[in-house]
Amino acid sequence: MAAPDNANQSLVVTAFWEVTPGEEAAVAGLLKEFLPQAQREPGVKEFQIHQNLAEPRKYFFYEVFAGEAAFADHQQTAHFKNIIVGQAVPKLAKRERSQFRFI
């Protein structure tokens, strides 16, 4: 599958989360609240959150933004600050993020 014409300007962000034992239900609820809001942001091309079938405390995020400015805007939204930073991150045992560009 070929990358879209404007893909070289896009920013791809991946994240891996591992939830602290006992916080699974709380984090799942927060992510269900957060996801539709993130998907509606103007600079978001794609935003998916996946839960590991074998290890349900682990999540994989796949996010595609129109560019670095759109990612910066995403991090300044009220839903990111309140739900992710304020509520979900404190319930994590581990959080890793990486940024990529299409080639």
Protein language model features and the residues they cover:
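Generic alpha-helical hydrophobic packing signal
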Residues: N8-S10, K32, Y62-F65, G86-Q87
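Alpha-helical structural elements of signaling/regulatory helical domains
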Residues: G22-E23, L53, F80
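Residue-level detector of intrinsically disordered, flexible termini
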Residues: M1-A2, T14, Q37, A69
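N-terminal first-folded block
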Residues: A7-Q39
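Glycine-rich beta-strand-turn "strand-cap" elements at beta-sheet edges
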Residues: M1-Q9, I49-E55, I84-I103
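An amphipathic, aromatic/His-enriched active-site/gating alpha helix that lines ligand/cofactor pockets
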Residues: Q39-K45, V64-S98
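Short, well-ordered beta-strand segments in beta-rich or mixed alpha/beta enzyme
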Residues: L11-E18, Q48-Q75
